[in-house]
């Protein structure tokens, strides 16, 4: 029994009919498309896809899905920037993107040491007596002569003088009750004035 060796199996025939995709990496094709288009405003996804289709003869059926995925990944990693739905290469001379909010102020070494010393001093319990209220007295100069107090007025100290205790000799006896009046009861008001008696001279 003879076999035809020139015919392969059905699976080999089917695999030979499938197109083989030997494509460069998508990030490489995307960067080449943006550089070739050279648009100062960037390129959108549709323009990049059309440029890749014009340069590559065979593309996989999921070409747009793969293109969207790689564009998103390149934007996250900073390889591309997106401005108004257009992709472009970042400017190498541009300053780094500033984050939100006010940047923290960098402390110098002296400020850091002072802050650390303040924290340590606050944790140590102070053994000094508590400071009284008010302004502390001004320190006296030992070279200055002592100032004498100037007494003005009568020299009497302020305030009410202390009450002096009474002695036995100064004790005043209580007045005796007035004797009961035996005469007529005195009426109210001022008593009438008594007129003086005029004595006639003798021999008139």
Swiss-Prot record:
GO MF entries: DNA binding
Impact reported for residue 98 to G: Loss of the nuclear accumulation
Chain positions covered by the region annotation Disordered: 1-23, 86-204
Keywords from the named record: Acetylation, DNA-binding, Nucleus, Repeat
Compositionally biased region (Basic and acidic residues): 138-147
One cellular-component annotation, GO: nucleus
Consequence recorded when altering residue 164 to G: Loss of the nuclear accumulation
Motif (Nuclear localization signal 2 (NLS)): 162-166
Motif interval(s): Nuclear localization signal 1 (NLS): 96-102
Post-translational modification (record): Acetylated.
Biased composition (Low complexity): 114-129, 195-204
DNA-binding region per Swiss-Prot/TrEMBL record: 97-105, 130-138, 155-163, 183-193
Entries under PROSITE patterns matching the protein: H15
Polar residues bias spans: 10-19
Keyword presence, Repeat: yes
Subcellular locations according to the entry: Nucleus; Nucleus, Nucleolus
H15 domain mapped to chain residues: 22-91
Cysteine-cysteine disulfides: none
UniProt note on tissues of expression: Mostly expressed in flowers (especially in styles and filaments, and, at lower levels, in sepals and ovaries) and developing siliques, and, to a lower extent, in leaves, cotyledons, lateral roots and root tips.
Biological role: Binds A/T-rich DNA with a highly dynamic distribution into the nucleus.
Membership in a protein family: Belongs to the HMGA family.
Name of the featured protein: HMG-Y-related protein A
Species name: Arabidopsis thaliana
């Amino acid at each position: 029994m003879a076999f035809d060796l020139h015919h392969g199996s059905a699976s080999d025939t089917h695999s030979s009919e499938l197109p083989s995709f030997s494509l460069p990496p998508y990030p490489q094709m995307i960067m080449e498309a943006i550089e070739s288009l050279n648009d100062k405003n960037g390129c959108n996804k549709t323009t990049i896809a059309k440029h890749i289709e014009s340069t590559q003869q065979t593309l996989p059926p999921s070409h747009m899905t793969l293109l969207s995925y790689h564009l998103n990944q390149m934007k996250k990693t900073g390889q591309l920037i997106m401005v108004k739905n257009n992709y472009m290469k970042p400017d190498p001379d541009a300053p780094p993107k500033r984050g939100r909010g006010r940047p923290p102020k960098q402390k110098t070494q002296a400020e850091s040491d002072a802050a650390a010393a303040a924290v340590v001093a606050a944790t140590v319990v102070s053994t000094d007596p508590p400071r009284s209220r008010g302004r502390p007295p001004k320190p006296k100069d030992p070279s200055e002569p002592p100032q004498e107090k100037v007494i003005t007025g009568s020299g009497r100290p302020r305030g009410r003088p202390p009450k002096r205790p009474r002695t036995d000799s100064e004790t005043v006896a209580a007045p005796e009750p007035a004797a009961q009046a035996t005469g007529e009861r005195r009426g109210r008001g001022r008593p009438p004035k008594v007129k003086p008696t005029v004595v006639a001279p003798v021999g008139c």
